[in-house]
Each structure stands twice: as structure tokens, then as C-alpha cells.
Amino acid sequence: MQKYELMFIINPSLQEEERNKLIGEIKAELKSASLKIINEDVWGEKDFAYKIKGSKNGYYIVYKLESERCEFFDLVKSFNLKKDIWRHLFLKIED
């Protein structure tokens, strides 16, 4: 199995209910892409080195994932269309 790490920066001004809904959507998309969530690490709000979308901070979430194979194109396209996901980064973890 191949392992991956995925980090999100989410709009910090979202209410908890909205943020949980967005996180639920992200998890559903990961599952539909045959990615198994091994670990979810919520960092919470952290300051940026520079402003992103006029904000000095963002809400960080990091996932450790594994899968036999993954279609990243559709996931990245979907994440790019969500206005409250400000940044995301997929990394392939070498054993």
C-alpha cells in the first residue's frame, strides 16, 4: 500500500458547524477515491507568514492516508472548487 499525507488550510472564519460540514465532505471525497484515513491531526488555527485571502491565519488539518492507487486529478479539482479550502498539499510518503 502507498502512503500519503494531505494538508488543508481552511477559512478560519467558518462557524464550527460549517467547518465540520466541510470536513465531512472532504472525508467523503477521500473515501470515494479509495483513500483510507489512517490518522487525522487537527492543528486548529495557526498564523501565516504572509496574508492569504486577506487573512493572517487559517485552520489547519493534516491527514495520513493509504491506498492501493489514487486518482488525484479529480480530488484536486474538487478541492480547488471549494471556496473555503484555501490551500491543500498532497505528499507521497516513501517507506
Predicted regions located by residue number:
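Long, contiguous binding/interaction regions
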Residues: M1-G58, E66-D95
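S-adenosyl-L-methionine
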Residues: Y63
